[in-house]
UniProtKB/Swiss-Prot annotation:
Pfam families: His_Phos_1 (PF00300). It comes from the Bacteria. Substrate binds at residues 8-15, 21-22, 60, 87-90, 98, 114-115, 183-184. It comes from Bacillus thuringiensis subsp. konkukian (strain 97-27). Its EC number is 5.4.2.11. It catalyses: (2R)-2-phosphoglycerate = (2R)-3-phosphoglycerate. This is 2,3-bisphosphoglycerate-dependent phosphoglycerate mutase. Keywords: Gluconeogenesis, Glycolysis, Isomerase.
Length: 245
């Protein structure tokens, strides 16, 4: 049996401020730092270890992974970073307060932008200061590859390309893998692994910094999955609450 651990980054400063974040490189809040330490402690107490780790090129996911591995005394584990594991790009919504955006465009429209799988928010323009094509972390991207906005289908496409080329082969070789990423990135992976319908993924929420374990067969098909707490596996349908750590 193969085990894969997925973890969404701890609470970010813009999660705290209820802003659309996307590819904006926002750091963890103090609460997010605590959540990451707690996740590491949970994994350590439950006897987990890792051979290789994957994350995005955004600091909230990178720092969460660093803290988790530090808490587990696994700081030496190789870490691979890729923009393909970045959060969904929210286009011109990035940086905007979600409640204020709902007041401007209507709650129904904002809900469609956030939760539908194939509707993109308004795009950035290339002269927008939030357009980060020239950021050195994206130097390998061609101009047409850098998104100006994304729907979940767009996010899923790049995430699964990286899954099939980089992560799945490591799992099949017997490596113990952890992925520290973002809400919509993990939603994309869960949709693929569990073969969820479009309706099924709309209601799927991924909590911050709670380890989600997938037990997979030799073909990487899910046997079962569950969240972890200090007391071990959490019953299906339940999500453990964070403790102060």
């Amino acid at each position: 049996m193969i085990k894969l651990v997925l973890i969404r980054h701890g609470q970010s400063l813009w999660n705290l401020e209820n802003r659309f974040t996307g590819w904006t490189d926002v750091d963890l809040s103090e609460n997010g730092l605590s959540e990451a330490r707690e996740a590491g402690a949970i994994l350590k107490k439950n006897g987990y270890t890792f051979d290789v780790a994957y994350t995005s090129v955004l600091k909230r996911a990178i720092r969460t992974l660093w803290i988790v591995l530090h808490e587990m005394n696994l700081a030496w584990v190789p870490v691979h970073k890729s923009w393909k594991l970045n959060e969904r790009h929210y286009g011109a919504l990035q940086g905007l307060n979600k409640d204020e955006t709902a007041q401007k465009y209507g709650e129904e429209q904002v809900h469609i932008w956030r939760r539908s799988i194939d509707v993109r928010p308004p795009a950035l323009t290339e002269d927008d200061p939030r357009y980060e094509m020239n950021d050195p972390r994206y130097k390998t991207l061609k101009k047409g590859e850098f998104p100006l906005t994304e729907c979940l289908v767009d996010t899923e496409k790049r995430v699964l390309a990286y899954w099939h080329s980089e992560i799945a082969p490591k799992l099949k070789d017997g490596n113990k893998v952890i992925i520290s990423s973002h809400g919509n990135t993990i939603r994309s992976l869960v949709k693929y692994l569990d073969n969820l319908s479009s309706d099924g993924v709309v209601s799927l929420n991924i909590p911050t910094s709670i380890p989600l374990v997938y037990e997979l067969d030799e073909n990487l098909r899910p046997i079962r999955h569950y969240y972890l707490s200090m007391d071990g596996e959490v019953p299906e349908g339940e999500i453990p609450k964070h403790i102060t750590f």
